[in-house]
């Protein structure tokens, strides 16, 4: 039987390729996108589950456009209609079936996401009174003392989890202007990553 010997140069190149591949895989970042639901219908009874208003439907489309190139692998929503409708345009375009999470056990939820989607991008849609809790659960900074104002509809939070466990938080506006609070300067994209600044078309 004839034995074929591989040239030493080829073996060295193969070794380098495998080494770089392993390094790349181990150095992957996990990105969690967190956003509150879009504008809801307000002229209903307090105990009802409102849908999105016309402005909210437009914002849901803006969210899909904003995250179009981010390769979202999973989308999580609460049991309320307004979060599912906020996710719908992106879910449809990305061919993802949103999953429902329980927002009363956020620490467990966050640990599960980090474990199951290492190196991937995940979108989590919450509410004005849970967005800060979600950030805390994922180990990120909490930029506002307690919760978002109910009128803070246009903020998109990006939590980057590095392979060494370090977290980075960046906040951006998206869609039509609709907020009460202003993004703290230290979390603005141009402060964290000046090379990635893009014009705010709606501001």
Task: Give residue spans per PLM region.
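Long, charged/polar, surface-exposed segments that mediate recognition or autoinhibition
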Residues: 128
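Residue-level marker of intrinsically disordered, low-complexity segments enriched
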Residues: 1-4, 14, 98, 169, ...
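Bacterial Sec-dependent N-terminal signal peptides
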Residues: 1-29
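Active-site-proximal alpha-helix that buttresses catalytic centers in soluble enzyme cores
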Residues: 28-117, 131-137, 141-147, 152-156, ...
């Amino acid at each position: 039987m004839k034995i074929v010997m591989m040239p030493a140069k080829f073996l060295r190149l193969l070794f380098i390729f495998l080494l770089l591949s392993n390094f790349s895989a181990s150095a992957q970042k996990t990105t969690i996108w967190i956003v509150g639901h879009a504008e809801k219908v307000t002229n209903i009874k307090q105990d009802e589950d409102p849908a999105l208003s016309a402005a909210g439907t437009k914002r849901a489309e803006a969210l899909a456009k904003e995250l179009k190139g981010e390769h979202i692998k999973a989308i999580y929503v609460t049991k309320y209609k307004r979060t599912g409708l906020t996710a719908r345009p992106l879910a449809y375009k990305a061919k993802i079936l949103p999953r429902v999470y329980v927002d009363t056990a956020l620490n467990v939820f966050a640990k599960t996401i980090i474990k199951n989607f290492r190196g991937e991008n995940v979108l989590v849609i919450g509410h004005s009174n849970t967005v800060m809790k979600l950030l805390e659960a994922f180990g990120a900074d909490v930029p506002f003392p307690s919760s978002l104002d109910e009128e803070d509809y246009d903020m998109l939070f990006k939590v980057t989890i590095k392979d060494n466990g370090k977290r980075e938080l960046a906040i951006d506006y998206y869609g039509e202007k609709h907020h009460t609070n202003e993004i703290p300067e230290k979390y603005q994209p141009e402060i964290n990553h000046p090379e990635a600044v893009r014009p705010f078309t709606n501001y």
